[in-house]
């Protein structure tokens, strides 16, 4: 095997594995931010930028074919931004942090995976069922009352029960767990992660109590803070800042 001076098969393998994992993690975070913003804008467009529809998404049933198309793509981009890429990030964080506290790292990972699974089901359901109900509602002679009831049930389940209750708890567990695991080497980021986790719990509490305005206000803060968290983490991973400098310590090795 040809080798450059000072290199070894082991170091080459580790370098390759690190670049792959590091690139995948940073790429997933960038997709979350970029595609997530697009998803949010599509949701706002589907809701026709109406504050009353934003507060009560069930009213979207009267949006017509244009809103149906926008809702379809908004939910799909939501699936491929906020949910599926999070799996990559969660596994990378677990790999980097599990040696510190295996049980805490596992709990944080399970919180992240629970968030991904529940939220993905909600996004997929909204993408496939919601637009069909909106189009059916717009048809002449449609049973609009029954369709509106079905659409209202769908939005209550997806928005209030899954995204703003179950997901809020799961992602809070992940954020707080990561904040505890990173409190020694990245104290500022760790505090920010724990604070973001608490904000998720506060929004969840307001949702359960029916305080819609307070819930939406907190979620607005969460939206901005989450972007900051993603970009901050991407810089830490890409810059190989502790604890991400030795993510490849368990990478498979080969003998020459």
Give the predicted meaning of each segment:
Residues 2-255:
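Hydrophobic, aromatic-enriched alpha-helical segments typical of multi-pass transmembrane helices
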């Amino acid at each position: 095997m040809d080798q450059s001076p000072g290199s070894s098969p082991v170091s080459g393998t580790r370098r390759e594995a690190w670049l792959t994992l590091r690139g995948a993690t940073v790429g997933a975070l960038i997709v979350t931010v970029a595609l997530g913003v697009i998803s949010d804008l599509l949701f706002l467009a589907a809701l026709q930028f109406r504050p009353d529809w934003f507060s009560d998404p069930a009213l979207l049933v009267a949006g017509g074919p244009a809103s149906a198309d926008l809702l379809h793509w908004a939910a799909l981009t939501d699936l491929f931004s906020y949910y599926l890429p999070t799996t990559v990030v969660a596994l990378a964080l677990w790999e980097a942090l599990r040696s510190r506290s295996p049980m805490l790292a596992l709990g944080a990972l399970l919180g992240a995976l629970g968030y991904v699974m529940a939220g993905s089901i909600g996004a997929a359901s909204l993408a496939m069922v919601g637009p069909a109900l909106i189009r059916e509602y717009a048809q002449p002679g449609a049973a609009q009352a029954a369709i509106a009831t079905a659409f209202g049930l769908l939005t209550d389940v997806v928005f209030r029960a899954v995204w703003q209750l179950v997901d809020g708890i799961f992602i809070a567990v992940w954020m707080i767990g990561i904040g505890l695991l990173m409190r020694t080497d990245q104290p500022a980021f760790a505090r920010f992660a724990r604070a973001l986790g608490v904000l998720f719990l506060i929004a969840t509490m307001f949702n359960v109590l029916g305080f819609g305005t307070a819930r939406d206000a907190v979620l607005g803060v969460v939206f901005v803070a989450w972007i900051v968290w993603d970009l901050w983490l991407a810089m830490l991973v890409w810059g190989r800042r502790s604890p991400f400098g030795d993510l490849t310590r368990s990478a498979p090795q080969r003998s020459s």
